[in-house]
Amino acid sequence: MDNIRNFSIIAHIDHGKSTLADRIIQLCGGLSDREMEAQVLDSMDIEKERGITIKAQTAALSYKARDGKVYNLNLIDTPGHVDFSYEVSRSLSACEGALLVVDASQGVEAQTVANCYTAIELGVEVVPVLNKIDLPAADPDSAIQEIEDVIGIDAQDATRCSAKTGVGVPDVLEALIAKVPAPKGDPDAPLQALIIDSWFDNYVGVVMLVRVVNGTLRAKDKVLLMATGAQHLVEQVGVFSPKSVPRESLSAGQVGFVIAGIKELKAAKVGDTITHVVPRKADAPLPGFKEVKPQVFAGLYPVEANQYEALRESLEKLQLNDASLQFEPEVSQALGFGFRCGFLGLLHMEIVQERLEREFDMDLITTAPTVVYQVMQRDGTTVQVENPAKMPDPSKIESILEPIVTVNLYMPQEYVGAVITLCEQKRGSQINMSYHGRQVQLTYEIPMGEIVLDFFDRLKSVSRGYASMDYEFKEYRPSDVVKVDMLINGDKVDALSIIVHRSNSAYRGREVAAKMREIIPRQMYDVAIQAAIGSNVIARENVKALRKNVLAKCYGGDISRKKKLLEKQKEGKKRMKQVGSVEIPQEAFLAILRVEEK
């Protein structure tokens, strides 16, 4: 056990985490040169393209150090994005050490800090590494200063390397072996193994990635999953080198995979503890397990109504590999049949949409994302509302609570003003502001409903892409939010309802109505577009009727003749308006999303 090192790599997007992992795998001979490809550990295409890691992956490597001993290194690759922060904390709790990779030309970024604090809270030894020192713009000294200022760990002896060229990578491994402690644990104690991640394989069912904390796990053992209470028979255990290599057993301190004939992911929850059924069951599960709750909801509808079943199948297949995705059927008068889906955050939502479109060839319409509001009713009950259409009648509502998130923003000094203005527009309240060299850290509390619409895009545009952010849920607070309904000729259109703060409601109502006016085609009669809160109309636009010139045949002549013709036309229009219904084009729903992006 003294020769095992479990570690993960913490880095911001594009700071070279996956490349460094590739180099380490190559150096330790985990894959032959023929099998080596860029970003070995990112298995989904979308991970490679966006350069992000979504699912955790591992590699068990052996490395002969300069002191002549052979060490077993277990690299656990973690997602870097805030939406997947629970997966990150589980991956980190399976390690004793973490390499903090910082781009020497860019310095510290927000997500690095968020994940680094998670690591420090979990008692993981953080080893700073400066990457990309081969770049002409690299400034290692100021990067070291930033690590010390922002994160507060000693970085004077940070290892310098370039993952692209391979310079300094052996030094990184030596530093890792020297600084990271060996795992503690008793191979003879009752079994406790932490599920770091799980995914679905078409041939063997669910594959669980585990870190054995105490005890030994062998094939043919009967095991119990403590959170669900389900029992399974282990079929196979082994390690990834990144290829899967079966082993006879996994003992304390090791990281590997377990296949136990589980059919669905819901049964193997990330963060759960595996123990033996007989003869010795562990007394308590490992700490830190929690159910992941979706934070952002949106409706997904197929463009073609006959694609509904196909969309259901696609979502079910995605759910096999992504237990945090939730969905339930939903019917909208305007868009037909679809699903209300729950996501961990905005990035998660984009990834799910992109995977549906790319891997399953679906054409989708997405409604505006919303968050979960808690509505206290007059009769003392509380309801959770994640869909504007389900908001109770205003007369029954006592108060509405909205989720507030704490947002940490990092940006160069020159963009502070623009970012503060943006946060104020989004009803944020400033908590803290501190300077670290050229970088500024701002902490705000902002309602989550304001974040999910377009905060991230706007932040990137006001700071020319230099600002980075991460957010975490803080609490629910009472807020004066209202539901704005859109009426067309007096009929409510459910899919266009939005929940906004009262102070912003008139502006948003006007914007949406104006946008709809451009999009709805002219009819033979006037079409009234109204935005209303309850029965109170706050904005109105008219789409003018198309009319035929009925006076064209009267050359001169008597006024009463003209009046008669005009009256007759008016009568006809009135009758039409009673029976006619306005078709709302699909673009209108997308327009609502566009309004929010302005």
From Swiss-Prot:
It is a peripheral membrane protein. The keyword Protein biosynthesis applies. GO terms for biological process: positive regulation of translation. One of its GO terms (cellular component) is plasma membrane. Keywords: Cell inner membrane, Cell membrane, GTP-binding, Hydrolase, Membrane, Nucleotide-binding, Protein biosynthesis. GTP binds at residues 14-19, 131-134. It holds the Pfam family GTP_EFTU_D2. Residues 2-184 form the tr-type G domain. It is an enzyme of class 3 (hydrolase). Its EC number is 3.6.5.n1. It catalyses: GTP + H2O = GDP + phosphate + H(+). GO terms for molecular function: GTP binding; GTPase activity; guanosine tetraphosphate binding; ribosome binding; translation elongation factor activity. It is found in: Cell inner membrane. It comes from the Bacteria. InterPro entries: EF-4, EFG_III/V, EFG_V-like, EFTu-like_2, G_TR_CS, LepA_C_sf, LepA_CTD, LepA_IV. Belongs to the TRAFAC class translation factor GTPase superfamily. Classic translation factor GTPase family. LepA subfamily. Required for accurate and efficient protein synthesis under certain stress conditions. May act as a fidelity factor of the translation reaction, by catalyzing a one-codon backward translocation of tRNAs on improperly translocated ribosomes. Back-translocation proceeds from a post-translocation (POST) complex to a pre-translocation (PRE) complex, thus giving elongation factor G a second chance to translocate the tRNAs correctly. Binds to ribosomes in a GTP-dependent manner. This is Elongation factor 4. It comes from Ralstonia nicotianae (strain ATCC BAA-1114 / GMI1000). The gene is lepA.
